Amino acid sequence: MRILRRRLGLALGSANTLSRAEIIALTRRAEELGYESVWAGESWGFDAFTTLTELAVHTSTIKIGTHIATIFSRTPGMLAQSAASLDDISGGRLILGLGTSGPKVVRDWHGQSWERPLRRMREVIDIVRLALSGERVDYEGELFKVSGFRLRAALSKRDVPIMIASLGHRSVGQTGEIADGWLPIFPTTALVRESLIWLAQGAVRAKRDTTAVEIAPTLLTAVSDDDAAVRDMARAHLAFYIGGMGSFYHDLVIRQGFATEADRIKSAWAKPRREGREAAAAAVTDEMLDAITLVGSRTSVLGRLSAYADAGVTLPILMFPFGADRALVEQTLEALRPDRQ
């Protein structure tokens, strides 16, 4: 059994349950404790690039990552501009995490058609990499045609790492072909092991080193002696994703062996708001929590981190459940501090 040392990331999400001042303070504390990276997401809350810009100017060494920036809400050119700006502001600390999001958010929030996500991801990354290289961009793809422009910005001498949030067999395989890292969310250790096969197959197709891809899953985490309280938070969090975020997470949980639970959660979520939320959370079983989350005592959470390390994870990214206040976040950060593992 292995414990990952000095390699932990911190995901802030986009629910904005903490104030901006609290987020800055927590990020600075994470930097002091040896956390390697901080990640900001975006769904329909604050956008990731603005949040990370604020964090970049208040920190000096911790890496900053988009978690994730959706490729359906920005053009490849805009993504390249934003990445170049943030990498410059942060002094070369950016990790560009990209994802397709899902049909519900893309169609109902951004008003865009969710079409050909795999092809779009491939072309977006092609164009962004070309733009960030400083070369003139002349690109003719199936979805994007860009001609005659060179990014007008002071560019870093390094290659900005690009990581992909992917779930399915084909998308994970493509991640192995074209990305520097894989950003799954809520995987079991069994799914990590299975997906590493798909990643390796993609890397082989692209004639890449099969170990070149960072394995950085998002893991729902809370360390507390009040086991019942944090498990209830985790139940509510998973219920929201499985029941209220379209079919993506519902299908993911089914793939991981929890079909009955997933259907019960989705059915409960469809009920009137308060009744539905409570029923959906109650349908999240202890077996699901034990397989998918890291909540409980310090000893139990460190044991779970070791299990993920054994499965092939290289950089766990810790996400806190909805309802976690600053005290719980600080307690968790201190309990898992990389400089003491």
Predicted regions and their residues:
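Active-site-adjacent structural elements that line small-molecule/cofactor binding pockets in enzymes
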Residues: M1-Q341
